[in-house]
Amino acid sequence: GGEVLKTFGANTVLLAGADVLPSLASGAIDATEWIGPAADLGKGLHQAAQYYYNPGWHEPATILDCSIDMFEWEKLDDATRELITVASKAVNMEVLSFFQAVNDSSYQKLINEHGVQMRQLPDDVMNALGQRAGEVCSSIAAEDPVSQELFSHIVEFRSSILRWTNTSEKEYMRVRSLPFTYPSA
């Protein structure tokens, strides 16, 4: 996201987590991107920022990475590799599920208890960011053949998955938003 914002003239800085709130409060930085409502509330970012912009255009969700040097990975036996793979998937799913469960109550708390004003980025801004993100990623990918191959797979998969997403998740969320009600328990 930072590389994309730079192309629009933003000055981006990478800070240690402990330095984000003080830098925001002092005006050393004008804005920050952290994780999501629950983590943002826990970090106290509302103490220094009264506006909260959605959606997060640069990352679809909170995801954990587990990076292991390929040469070291290949030295591990199959059982250890499987253990690491299964444990990594389980932790990632647990963290994703946790944040999905607590983000709405944190979002409401930011609004109702701390007076944070929620704003939605307009479609023309989202389109410009998305277009520029593609250009930045393409430029970075062009620097070496491995990156280019990975990027082409990502673009191909994105095209494919968007067809299914429009039929499945997007429609599911549309239906969930219909005004039907459930009887009280």
Residue ranges and their predicted role:
Residues G1-A185:
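N-terminal secretory/targeting leader peptides
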